[in-house]
Amino acid sequence: MAKLTVKDVDLKGKKVLVRVDFNVPLKDGVITNDNRITAALPTIKYIIEQGGRAILFSHLGRVKEEADKAGKSLAPVAADLAAKLGQDVVFPGVTRGAELEAAINALEDGQVLLVENTRYEDVDGKKESKNDPELGKYWASLGDGIFVNDAFGTAHRAHASNVGISANVEKAVAGFLLENEIAYIQEAVETPERPFVAILGGSKVSDKIGVIENLLEKADNVLIGGGMTYTFYKAQGIEIGNSLVEEDKLDVAKALLEKANGKLILPVDSKEANAFAGYTEVRDTEGEAVSEGFLGLDIGPKSIAKFDEALTGAKTVVWNGPMGVFENPDFQAGTIGVMDAIVKQPGVKSIIGGGDSAAAAINLGRADKFSWISTGGGASMELLEGKVLPGLAALTEK
């Protein structure tokens, strides 16, 4: 990566501004999944071990009006982070003003401060989300000229707390998490060890058009599963029963199949049910066609075997999107089968592109078997599309 990283700058005695991604799920004020906090620890620990004073910025959820602030405070995150670091985390509970400035100026080397939810600034004219220049300049003024971006999850957005601060500091550098995310995903797509197989699932073709187009050029094979299978089926005139379909994307699906030259591998059977919820019958289809009055909710056993074969010998695998409705035990065999086929390949570099696939790997007990699980759904999708991420582009060149 041709950008400066946190290891390239002198941090001792400096007030170091850090964009982290602490956008964690909360239920009744309790954090239900703290993976993103854990993922940021190496960078935070490195800064304080080097004698820096870490000033952390993060958003949490969406805040559009004053009433939205309730339940969106980073206070529970500050407490969780303090427990993980084994030291106090200063939390003034504001995003600007004299109280925040005084708390920052009182910091000593090795201390950590967390600014309140950056999206509180969205209540008045969406200043954070629209990258208000004055806000970026103000936040930049709170530090000593060094900004560390470690929030891969928002790297595809140009906000005041990433791009805005970057534009107003002497050095904007990547943290360890951001560096790893870029290294794993970009290298997998741009300079993969071959055979390189991509697996794309999820419900909508529309979400993945750019990704499929880019990966058809880069990968040796692209396997398709999940709900978007049925849009590809219908585009070929295959019966899909009541399965999910994007009627307005049939031409796109047809064009992708024609362009693919056999690289696009579709399922050959499905697990079908007579309703999405409250079904009374679940069965495997004979072939591709889904029965009348039924809908496909997972790939079937023949497809699992076919995908297993397509993955044999793969050296690089990128997976984004489950094969079926994996939250339901009746429809998780496809996702489990594909995960197991990936991780059993000897010497494979296996990467999960965030979102539902990451949740599936974690919930189904396979997370530790993958080389890398991305922390950013949207950002990893844009990298897989070959797009330039604004948060990354704003960093200082080496």
UniProtKB/Swiss-Prot annotation:
Superkingdom per UniProt: Bacteria
Residues reported in the UniProt entry to bind substrate: 21-23, 36, 59-62, 119, 157
Catalytic activity from the UniProt record: (2R)-3-phosphoglycerate + ATP = (2R)-3-phospho-glyceroyl phosphate + ADP
InterPro entries, per the entry: Phosphoglycerate_kinase, Phosphoglycerate_kinase_CS, Phosphoglycerate_kinase_N, Phosphoglycerate_kinase_sf
Short name of one Pfam family: PGK
Keyword flag Transferase: yes
Biochemical pathway: Carbohydrate degradation; glycolysis; pyruvate from D-glyceraldehyde 3-phosphate: step 2/5
Keywords, ordered alphabetically: ATP-binding, Cytoplasm, Glycolysis, Kinase, Nucleotide-binding, Transferase
Residues engaged in binding ATP: 208, 296, 327, 354-357
The EC number(s) this enzyme carries: 2.7.2.3
Keyword Hydrolase on entry: no
Principal location: cytoplasm
Annotated GO CC locations: cytosol
Residues that span the membrane, as ranges: none
GO MF, one annotated term: phosphoglycerate kinase activity
Family, as annotated: Belongs to the phosphoglycerate kinase family.
Assembly, per entry: Monomer.
Protein name, as recorded: Phosphoglycerate kinase
